[in-house]
């Protein structure tokens, strides 16, 4: 079971109840936790390794280094990680070298104690640059204070064009049915041709696979280039999103096992354009999933990360962990970004086979989506749309 995906159940069901759009990046969350684990020991390390599915920290770092190499080879994706360290803290050399080699994270010295807002502005500049200006002011003034000692941050920017673009003259305005029974008229992308699609009638949903163009770093189409796609999961019932999300996060490899295996005629084929951002309190969700030690001032052991130069020396715990994501889907393609950050502060002491037959696919009520690299089976983003007219 991918415990990072479990976060989507806790945060996603809350968003469904609030009738809010939602997206998070399991890849960004995993990267943030893996970097944190490098600086932990004892029960804190044990919990993080168990949560991330690794037997040993060396195994986790090797997997992180492999994933970092893969991401650097994906032209559609850029990834950056940073460690923002207060002047009262010295990073341990082993943590610093492993963070750079396995996680691509490099330290920057800041003054949280005396210039917390200036430090926040520097973290914001890092995130904005890494997301090509899509995420600005992620850290609000007042988020950091004199008790903030270290911030671990990562940011990811994904931008890809459709392998077969939607024509703007085919875009139609039609009604989208919200969960509360109200309706809103929004533009729908339309392409009534053959698509990779599947029906899972017994489980109550359909899946549409929309391919992104396979390009190399030179911007040209290359066979053998990374294979990205968006999977749109449409519940057959208008109120079926919660049940669908439950399957997605509890069934092993659910998202990847639902990838359609064959093309078929899909008419009509319509998906609304959407654009929104969402935020996640990862600390609260992770604690509910049993990962509590890093966030407990009495139990956290971040002793392999840094040494305090203060007298008496201070121990650290993770006082906050948050993620912000944004996505835009239109006729040209998709842009999706994420930023995940952790604040370290001192303590005080597979589904059934689908039935191949002609089908329609009109996403006119709440649906789930995933952006994946399907040859490596990596889920970059997972989210749902409750109201495509809401851009907040």
From Swiss-Prot:
Superkingdom, natural source: Eukaryota
Gene Ontology, cellular component aspect: extracellular space
Region (RCL): 333-357
GO molecular function: serine-type endopeptidase inhibitor activity
Alphabetized SUPFAM superfamilies for the sequence: Serpins
Residues marked Reactive bond (site): 347-348
Pfam families (UniProt xref): Serpin (PF00079)
CDD domains: serpinP_plants (cd02043)
Similarity section: Belongs to the serpin family.
Domains as described in the record: The reactive center loop (RCL) extends out from the body of the protein and directs binding to the target protease. The protease cleaves the serpin at the reactive site within the RCL, establishing a covalent linkage between the carboxyl group of the serpin reactive site and the serine hydroxyl of the protease. The resulting inactive serpin-protease complex is highly stable.
Name assigned to this protein: Putative non-inhibitory serpin-10
Organism: Oryza sativa subsp. japonica
């Amino acid at each position: 079971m991918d415990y990072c995906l479990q976060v989507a159940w806790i945060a996603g069901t809350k968003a469904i109840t609030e009738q809010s759009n939602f997206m998070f990046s399991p890849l960004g969350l995993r990267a943030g936790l893996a970097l944190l684990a490098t600086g932990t020991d004892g029960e804190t390390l044990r919990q993080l390794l168990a949560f991330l599915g690794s037997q040993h920290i060396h195994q986790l770092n090797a997997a992180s280094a492999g994933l970092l190499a893969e991401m650097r080879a994906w032209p559609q994706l850029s990834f950056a990680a940073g460690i923002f360290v207060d002047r009262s803290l010295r990073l341990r050399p082993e943590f610093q070298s492993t963070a750079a080699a396995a996680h691509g994270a490099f330290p920057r010295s800041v003054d949280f104690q005396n210039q917390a807002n200036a430090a926040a502005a520097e973290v914001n500049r890092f995130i904005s640059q890494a997301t090509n200006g899509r995420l600005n002011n992620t850290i609000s003034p007042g988020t950091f204070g004199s008790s903030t000692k270290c911030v671990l941050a990562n940011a990811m920017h994904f931008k890809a064009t459709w392998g077969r673009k939607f024509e703007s003259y085919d875009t139609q305005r039609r009604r989208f049915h919200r969960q509360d029974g109200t309706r809103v008229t929004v533009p729908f992308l339309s392409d009534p041709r053959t698509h990779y699609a599947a029906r899972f009638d017994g489980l109550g949903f359909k899946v549409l696979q929309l391919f992104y163009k396979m390009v190399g770093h030179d911007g040209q189409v290359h066979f053998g280039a990374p294979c990205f796609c968006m999977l749109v999961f449409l519940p057959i019932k208008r109120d079926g999103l919660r049940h669908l999300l439950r399957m997605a996060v509890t069934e092993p490899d659910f998202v990847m096992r639902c990838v359609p295996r064959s093309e078929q005629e899909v008419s009509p084929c319509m998906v609304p354009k959407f654009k929104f951002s969402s935020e996640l309190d990862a600390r609260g969700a992770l604690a509910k999933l049993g990962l509590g030690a890093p966030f407990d001032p009495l139990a956290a052991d971040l002793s392999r990360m840094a040494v305090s130069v203060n007298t008496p020396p201070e121990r650290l715990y993770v006082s906050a962990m948050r993620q912000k994501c944004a996505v835009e889907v239109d006729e040209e393609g998709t842009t999706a970004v994420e930023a995940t950050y952790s604040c370290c502060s001192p303590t005080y002491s597979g589904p059934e086979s689908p039935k191949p037959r002609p089908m329609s696919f009109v996403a006119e009520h709440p649906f789930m989506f995933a952006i994946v690299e399907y040859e490596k089976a990596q889920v970059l983003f997972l989210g749902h749309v409750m109201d495509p007219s809401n851009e907040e």
